[in-house]
UniProtKB/Swiss-Prot annotation:
Polar residues bias locations: 409-422
InterPro entries, sorted: Cholcskin_rcpt, Cholcy_rcpt_A, CholecystokininA_recpt_N, CholecystokininA_recpt_N_sf, GPCR_Rhodpsn, GPCR_Rhodpsn_7TM
Name this polypeptide is given: Cholecystokinin receptor type A
Summary of the function given for this chain in its UniProt record: Receptor for cholecystokinin. Mediates pancreatic growth and enzyme secretion, smooth muscle contraction of the gall bladder and stomach. Has a 1000-fold higher affinity for CCK rather than for gastrin. It modulates feeding and dopamine-induced behavior in the central and peripheral nervous system. This receptor mediates its action by association with G proteins that activate a phosphatidylinositol-calcium second messenger system.
Segments crossing the lipid bilayer: 42-67, 78-104, 116-137, 158-178, 211-234, 314-334, 350-373
Residues forming coiled coils: none
Subcellular location: Cell membrane
Extracellular side of membrane: 1-41, 105-115, 179-210, 335-349
Family assignment from sequence similarity: Belongs to the G-protein coupled receptor 1 family.
Membrane topology (UniProt): Multi-pass membrane protein
Annotated glycan sites: 10, 24, 190
Length: 428
């Protein structure tokens, strides 16, 4: 049974898998509506273990790389470090204390652990969510408002925001150690067991608390992230259109003449008519350098376009994964707050276990989409762990691609940067 009833996938409690009733003032399991099939515990253990190992490994690597590599201590990476710590905390304090009691049908860790784990679970979920919001706002400022955001995009400001986030989360979740207690009950085999449950004094307070968590940990953060990443995607899309217009304008001003002997109005006609010998010498002297410059420009433009499209796709993945991981558990807890009996009948046992597992998945996908998908972080990882195989030095195309990929998360994708690059670009 879900004996750790107050264990947080999202800072709330989880229904038990059997319907509880009172007999002689003692809680008993009246029935077992969903008898677990033989394969379900094995699958549950396998999936929980896999998510646990991936989360611990991924977040530990992120923390190690960002702490040991001083060159990577940027404003964004400071937020990513805080996110990795909170995700690691979520994994360590949530998964074992949910899986083990679920399998044993008894919370065997005692009252002190019940209060401590529920408190740290709620705090880790809150910090993780607030960090995701802070990262989205920081990226919005860097890309869409680069000039205005320079004032507050400093390491000291990031550290203040992170400290405030942790203090606020610890404060918000103080009801958990106060109202989390062990509740004894009698199982169907007449053995006495315990549940770790978070129970407020009355139904109104319980419903208000769940509604409060639904707002501050899911709906409001989700809306903020959607708006921020939507505006960033719009900015990048406008940049893609700007690049296309610039490329078309450059082709119109600089038509190719290598494959045709006819000359129309333009530089080609002028170069053939005025002082042909000198022009030929100048062309011969300038051809290698100008050809290389044109190739670099073309490669840079292509890499920049591809990098912007990758960022847009990644932002969409971030928003989709946030809602996919957290919507089921928040919906389940809100349902249980307002209709306890119906929710416990339909969600008890295996359904709620896998809903919780889905929420825990966020702790292992965050390091992947925020860090390991970033080329600079991968290079920092290789620099931190020199024992790992290192790829050969990239060619000019790879260097340009790396530079442009890094720029997609900075201020160079702003409107100011587009106009600045356009004004300062050399003429054809």
């Amino acid at each position: 049974m879900e004996v750790a009833d107050s264990l947080l996938g999202n800072g709330s409690d989880v229904p038990p898998p059997c319907e509880l009733g009172l007999e002689n003032e003692t809680l008993v399991c009246l029935e077992q509506p969903r008898a677990a099939k033989e394969w379900q515990p094995a699958v549950q253990i396998l999936l929980y273990s896999l998510i646990f190992l991936l989360s611990v490994l991924g977040n530990t690597l992120v923390i190690t790389v960002l702490i040991r590599n001083k060159r990577m201590r940027t404003v964004t990476n400071i937020f990513l470090l805080s996110l990795a710590v909170s995700d690691l905390m979520l994994c360590l304090f949530c998964m074992p204390f949910n899986l083990i009691p679920n399998l044993l049908k008894d919370f065997i860790f005692g009252s002190a652990v019940c209060k401590t784990t529920t408190y740290f679970m709620g705090t880790s979920v809150s910090v993780s969510t607030f960090n995701l919001v802070a990262i989205s706002l920081e990226r919005y400022g860097a890309i869409c408002k680069p000039l205005q955001s320079r004032v507050w995009q400093t390491k000291s400001h990031a550290l203040k925001v992170i400290a405030t986030t942790w203090c606020l989360s610890f404060t918000i979740m103080t009801p958990y150690p106060i109202y989390s207690n062990l509740v004894p009950f009698t199982k169907t085999n007449n053995q006495t067991a315990n549940m770790c449950r978070f129970l407020l004094p009355n139904d109104v307070m319980q419903q208000s608390w769940h509604t409060f968590l639904l707002l501050i940990l899911f709906l409001i953060p989700g809306i903020v992230m959607m708006v921020a990443y939507g505006l960033i995607s719009l900015e990048l899309y406008q940049g893609i259109k700007f690049d296309a217009i610039q490329k078309k304008s450059a082709r119109d001003r600089n038509p190719s003449t290598g494959s045709s002997g006819r000359y129309e109005d333009g530089d080609g006609c002028y170069l053939q008519k005025a002082r042909p010998r000198r022009r030929l010498e100048l062309r011969q002297l300038s051809t290698p350098g100008s050809g290389r410059l044109n190739r670099i420009r073309s490669t840079s433009s292509t890499a920049n376009l591809m990098a912007k499209k990758r960022v847009i796709r990644m932002l969409m993945v971030i928003v989709v994964l946030f809602f996919l991981c957290w919507m089921p558990i928040f919906s389940a807890n809100a349902w249980r707050a307002y209709d306890t009996a119906s929710a416990e009948r339909r969600l008890s046992g295996t359904p709620i276990s896998f809903i919780l597992l889905l929420s825990y998945t966020s702790s292992c996908v965050n390091p992947i989409i925020y860090c390991f998908m970033n080329k600079r972080f991968r290079l920092g990882f290789l620099a931190t762990f020199p024992c790992c195989p290192h790829p050969g030095p990239p060619g000019p195309r790879g260097e340009v691609g790396e530079e442009e990929e890094g720029r997609t998360t900075g201020a160079s994708l702003s409107r100011y940067s587009y106009s600045h690059m356009s004004a300062s670009a050399p003429g054809p």
